[in-house]
């Protein structure tokens, strides 16, 4: 005879969800930091690089 399974308590469900959200937020912060670093790096590199059309002929 089939027996229904017990329900997971709400506190356990919420605890797992909050843990998952914490991990997701941490990954989001890491990604944003990395994107900011790369953007800043691109900003620093652009003025120093000369385009072929900007070079002065000798």
Curated annotation (Swiss-Prot):
BP-aspect Gene Ontology terms: translation
Primary location group: plastid
UniProt superkingdom: Eukaryota
Pfam families in alphabetical order: Ribosomal_L32p
Listed Low complexity bias regions: 44-58
InterPro entries: Ribosomal_bL32
Compartment(s) of residence: Plastid, Chloroplast
Molecular function as annotated in GO: structural constituent of ribosome
Signal peptide: none
This protein's record includes keyword Methyltransferase: no
Keywords per UniProt: Chloroplast, Plastid, Ribonucleoprotein, Ribosomal protein
GO cellular component: chloroplast; large ribosomal subunit
Chain positions covered by the region annotation Disordered: 1-21, 34-58
Protein family membership: Belongs to the bacterial ribosomal protein bL32 family.
Protein name: Large ribosomal subunit protein bL32c
Organism listed in the record: Cyanidioschyzon merolae (strain NIES-3377 / 10D) (Unicellular red alga)
